[in-house]
Amino acid sequence: MQIAFSGRLGSGKSTVCAILRDTYGYEIYSTGTVQRKVAEDMGISTLELNERMTKDPTLDHIIDDAVVKLSREKSGSQIVYDSRMAWHFAENTFKVYMYVDPTIAAKRVFNADRGDVEKYASEEDALNQLNARGNEENKRFKKIYNVDNFDYSNYHLIIDSTTPSPEQIADAIAKGAKDFEENPYTDTKMLVSPFVVFPTAPYGTDDEEEIVITLVDSVHYCVKGHNKLAALQLCGSAFAHATFQKNAPITPDKTLFKEYEKAANFKFFTNI
């Protein structure tokens, strides 16, 4: 089963990819890997290819076409495409998007040793730069491809790296890919920290349904399944199993957020 792996900046995709490679035997094809293969096929250096692509953004299609070709040629192989847009081009893949709370992403990249490539004055600076880069990237994708990389409905699985370990995430993705290969589906499943999902119903609401989550302005809200969400917050679970519902009507209420925080003695990661 091939996996198309996208996600937020600072979510830890590279670390998870390494575990999928070392533990589960997946080959990893990053954008850089594909670029090197394309440059080799063209008889030029990757530097020259990058220079050409910088001058002419329409040359992005060279990489896109290479991903399509690769996914066809290696259709029976275990491959992970670590690329923002692979979900749009790689055929017959399990499409995964990795979320992370923005403040946690900023903390990670600020404390990481990335040499002179990325430098940040503070965690706040890292947060602002990551948000700006992510939004700018997505604008570019919308302009070139007319798709929204942040739209959860493009993916089969949304997985959250805010609290779980990279090993837990890799295990969940490998299992998800196997399950999807055996029983394909078209909706969007979610494995997210219960501490990044805000309630829309009072604490103690008699709601025994499965958890359904929607996304509004990059914030997760619980549409259904508040009892289960509250129980997961109470026991400190790493993941809430949920289904994504696009454009669900909700009314954010900060008094509800405080009810849930007080009941389970925690704080939501994001302040809204």
Report each predicted region and the residues it spans.
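Conserved phosphate-donor/acceptor-positioning beta-strand/loop module used by diverse small-molecule
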Residues: 92-129
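Small-molecule kinase domains that catalyze NTP-dependent phosphoryl transfer to phosphate-bearing small molecules
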Residues: 118-169
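Walker A/P-loop
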Residues: 14
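Short alpha-helix boundary/capping and kink motifs at helix termini
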Residues: 178-221, 233
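A short, basic-hydrophobic beta/loop patch
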Residues: 207-262
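ATP-dependent small-molecule kinase phosphotransfer cores
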Residues: 27, 31-90, 103-104, 115-118, ...
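P-loop (Walker A) phosphate-binding loop of NTP-binding proteins
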Residues: 8
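Hydrophobic anchor at the beta1->P-loop junction of P-loop NTPases
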Residues: 5
